[in-house]
């Protein structure tokens, strides 16, 4: 069972269940669950609750996914997001062109870093370039 956050046609943002094929959503509010966010729902989505939800969605119509705007699953994380720098070396090589001293040491270990997020950009969403700060 896959959970998403979506903006409904009336503009309300609601956690929802995404169908197996990714073409339909069932807002949790339609199932009588009044969680404002997916973060609020997660602690209560026990295996028993998920099994009950699976039965419930089998009996009610869904919204086509094209009728909603998919958001980030957790649009406003309560904490910093921890990231794994898989492509750290590529960034290091690129940054070394600008400051060889700062990136002269090559790291072989995994690089973790955190990001502050006020609101996560949804899949396919616009990422502001901050052209006043950077050129590329």
Name the predicted role of every residue range.
Residues 1-106, 110-111:
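N-terminal non-catalytic cap/leader segment that marks the start of a structured domain
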Residues 8-10, 119, 136:
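A short catalytic or substrate-binding loop motif that flags glycine-/basic-rich loops and adjacent residues
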Residues 104-124:
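A gly/proline- and charged-residue-enriched helix-loop-helix capping module
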Residues 120-134:
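Active-site glycine-rich loop that binds ribose-phosphate moieties when present
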């Amino acid at each position: 069972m896959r959970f998403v956050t979506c903006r409904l046609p009336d503009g309300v943002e609601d956690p929802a269940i995404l169908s197996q094929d990714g073409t339909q959503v069932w807002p949790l509010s339609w199932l009588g669950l009044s969680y404002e966010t997916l973060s609020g729902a997660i602690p209560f989505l026990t295996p028993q609750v998920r099994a009950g939800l699976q039965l419930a969605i089998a009996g009610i119509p869904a919204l086509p996914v094209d009728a909603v705007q998919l958001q980030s699953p957790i649009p406003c994380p309560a904490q910093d997001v921890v990231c794994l720098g898989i492509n750290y070396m590529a960034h290091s090589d690129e940054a070394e062109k600008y400051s060889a001293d700062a990136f002269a040491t090559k790291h072989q270990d995994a690089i973790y870093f955190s990001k502050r997020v006020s609101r996560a950009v949804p899949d396919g969403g616009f990422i502001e370039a901050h052209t006043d700060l950077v050129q590329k």
